[in-house]
């Protein structure tokens, strides 16, 4: 199907759906964005996958293919999107403070405080945190600002797949408020 979907928010925003781990898919989404707007001002990287898998569980060793795909989507995919978007942002006319674009990556509290079974997810999100500063230094010369947000536990489609047995202890571990975050709160933080 078509990798590009559109939802009008205020006439000046849109989003593109792509397989972030595939260069051609991301480039197609970028091209569609350029067709509509003529430039890219902001990218919000939110792609992420993961589920619990112990290093050694009752079925044996953690599947290596699973570990690799989590890193492919969460870490390599984040890098793939930002590097291709940065090419286009570098063509923008500088605005206030000579800024040509903004990239916001999504990590996770798991980058700093991973739980049992989160080796792949935590490693991928720690990688997002770890690459942010060197990339910010690299892209700063082009007027591109890059930041990473490491949210706690949010009520996303990925979390919705978890059983109540998994969700309940996670909610109990939160400090305040005693609930999962909602996507609207994250959107307000990012914007």
Question: Would you name each region that the model predicts?
Answer:
Residues 148, 170-191:
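C-terminal helical subdomain
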Residues 82, 124, 132:
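Active-site helix of classical SDR
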Residues 50-68, 87, 91-97, 117-120, ...:
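Conserved mid-core segment of classical short-chain dehydrogenase/reductases
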Residues 49, 60-80, 104, 128:
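Catalytic Tyr-X3-Lys loop
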Residues 87, 137-138:
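Alpha-helical segment proximal to the catalytic Tyr-Lys
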Residues 17-29, 64, 184:
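The beta1-alpha1 cofactor-binding region of Rossmann-like NAD(H)/NADP(H)-dependent oxidoreductases
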Residues 1-4:
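Short, small-residue-biased leader/transition segments that mark boundaries at the very start
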Residues 108:
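Residue(s) in the substrate-gating loop at a strand-loop-helix junction
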């Amino acid at each position: 199907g078509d990798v590009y979907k559109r939802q009008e928010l205020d006439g000046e925003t849109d989003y593109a759906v792509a397989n972030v781990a595939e260069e051609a898919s991301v480039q197609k989404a970028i091209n569609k964005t350029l067709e509509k707007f003529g430039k890219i001002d902001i990218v919000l990287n939110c792609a992420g996958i993961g589920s619990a898998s112990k290093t050694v569980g009752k079925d044996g060793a953690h599947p290596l293919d699973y570990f690799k795909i989590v890193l492919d989507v969460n870490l390599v995919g984040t890098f793939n999107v930002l590097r291709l978007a940065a090419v286009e942002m570098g063509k923008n006319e500088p605005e206030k403070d000579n800024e040509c674009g903004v990239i916001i990556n999504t990590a996770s509290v798991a980058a700093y405080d991973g739980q049992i079974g989160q080796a792949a997810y935590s490693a991928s999100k720690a990688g997002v945190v770890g690459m942010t500063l060197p990339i910010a230094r690299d892209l700063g010369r082009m007027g591109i600002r890059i930041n990473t947000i490491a949210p706690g536990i949010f009520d996303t489609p990925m979390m919705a797949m978890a059983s109540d047995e998994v969700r309940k202890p996670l909610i109990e571990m939160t400090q305040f408020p005693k609930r999962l975050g909602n996507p609207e709160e994250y959107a307000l933080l990012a914007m």
